Amino acid sequence: MDAGMDLYIGSNEERDRVKEKLKEILLKQLSNPNVSTLLIAAILLDNEGRANNLPFNYNEDPNYVYVDEVIGLAIANEIAGTKAIFNFRFYDAKKPGIIGELDRKGFMFLDDAIAGLLAGCMSKVFE
């Protein structure tokens, strides 16, 4: 949740309300079977990558492999549609909080999945 708020640029007076709304939306979306299944897929793919069971060098995170972004985009789109897809690119590029931590620890899929989750939920906050 903190990573979602790291990129919040609204007024400080609204910050607590936005954070509470984000929490509510996050909890709701985690029970969405499409979102939760994509999050599970990201975790499983990271596990398979670490075990060298994917058809590319997982540790290099090669440019020609973009399925990790596809997972993040799918999560964002499921939650809040087109606006969340644009917001995903912002979270993916800035990598605030846990997203950056996951990226630095080599979680090729989960960092993008969480970026999609937060981008979608933050987009939903402002509907």
Curated annotation (Swiss-Prot):
Disulfide bonds: none annotated. It holds the Pfam family PgpA. CDD domains: PgpA. Coiled coil: none annotated. GO terms for molecular function: phosphatidylglycerophosphatase activity. GO terms for biological process: lipid metabolic process. InterPro entries: PgpA-like_sf, YutG/PgpA. It comes from the Archaea. This is Uncharacterized protein MJ1330. The lineage of its organism: Archaea, Methanobacteriati, Methanobacteriota, Methanomada group, Methanococci.
